[in-house]
Amino acid sequence: VAPFAGASKNDPRFQGTEDAPTISFLGRLDEPRKGLRVLADAIPTVLESVPRARFLIAGRGQAQEIRDELARFGDSVVFLGGVSDEDKAAMLASATCYVAPQTGGESFGIVLVEAMAAGTRVIASDLKAFSDVLADGRYGALFSNEDGGDLARVIIDTLRDAPAAQARQKAASQVVGRYDWATVTDEVLDVYDMALSTAHTRVTPAPGSRTMLGRLRDALDD
């Protein structure tokens, strides 16, 4: 997560303001499960409510039908194409919020962790993998999967209710370090050390633990 935590938060290409917020999306445009269709359904309602908002859509692929559909919004919807790792980090750090409207096929929300590390407000579909990372909405806002109307509502609420959004950002910043590879590696090694030293003793993990350590303990106990 370190490259995202250290990314510039003032890149003028991506930076939003209170009056003109930016909402970022990152994903393969022509891969349906990445959810661009869901975001496209939400955009008209958001722009009606927040006319100066800008949507920054990054990712490879054409999705020409959606591009044509959104062309009427002019500069309010910007297709960036594929972006470098450096630009990805700058976009996540500089944008007002990041939206992950994926509809399925996500085993772990690594992009949510990256956005959390960058310090942006996170909005995601309520897939189990995303809900787990965001602690059921404590670290980011969730919307009903595949529901563009609900996504629009959550984006508008996130932009308008700054104190609540900032509280989620602060909570996310306090826990995102647990996903750093150095931390995860240390935890994995600790689990293996524990397994070797307690080979004949059953280890009881903390009930309901969602940490990497807790999950590995569960696996070793089975």
Residue ranges and their predicted role:
Residues 6-8, 13-34, 40-43, 56:
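Conserved donor-binding/catalytic core segment of Leloir-type glycosyltransferases
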Residues 26, 54-67, 81:
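Glycosyltransferase donor-sugar binding loop
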Residues 100-104:
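Short Ser/Thr-rich beta->loop micro-motif in glycosyltransferases that lines
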Residues 136-137, 141-148, 157-163:
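Conserved acidic donor-binding segment of nucleotide-sugar-dependent glycosyltransferases
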Residues 66-87:
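Nucleotide-activated donor-binding/catalytic signature segment of Leloir-type glycosyltransferases, i.e.
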Residues 97, 121-124:
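Short hydrophobic beta-strand element within catalytic cores of glycosyltransferases
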Residues 163-193, 200-201, 205-214:
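A charged, aromatic-enriched C-terminal amphipathic alpha-helix characteristic of glycosyltransferases
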Residues 82-83, 90-95, 110:
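Short alpha-helical donor nucleotide-sugar binding micro-motif in glycosyltransferases
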